[in-house]
């Protein structure tokens, strides 16, 4: 799901509204830290060395800047498709959440933690939207 996140940030910056683009980039960046730690810890538990777990977790995030560059490039050249591109990026992220992340949290019995994390994340994003305009 790093690809649609990168695409969303790239499209946001390509659209010219710097305030919203920065808020989106900060929001996605904030959630990338615990996500990367989760990947690294998962790799450690199955026997990877700390170095390899760190490198692999970092490598999973490399798709974001690549897709960000693609998003900026497409929207810069074809500005009229900005709403469509933002809709596609948002839809891709919602699909990943609804079809992968939510079922996984409920399958393992962490419904309350997952709901709390979702609520806190939503409040942070709303706060950033209000503060950064």
Give each language-model segment a name.
Residues 3-133:
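Intrinsically disordered, metal-sensing/regulatory segments
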């Amino acid at each position: 799901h790093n690809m649609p996140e990168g695409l969303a940030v790239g499209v946001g910056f390509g659209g010219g509204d710097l305030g919203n683009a920065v808020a989106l980039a900060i929001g996605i960046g904030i959630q990338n830290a615990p996500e990367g730690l989760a990947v690294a810890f998962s790799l450690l538990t199955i026997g990877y060395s700390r170095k390899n777990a760190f490198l692999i977790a970092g490598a999973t995030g490399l798709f974001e800047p690549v897709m960000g560059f693609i998003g900026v490039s497409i929207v810069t050249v074809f500005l009229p498709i900005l709403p469509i591109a933002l809709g596609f990026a948002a839809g891709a992220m919602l699909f990943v959440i609804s079809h992968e992340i939510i079922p996984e949290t409920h399958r393992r019995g962490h419904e309350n933690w997952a709901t709390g994390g979702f609520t806190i994340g939503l409040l942070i994003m709303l706060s950033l939207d209000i503060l950064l305009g």
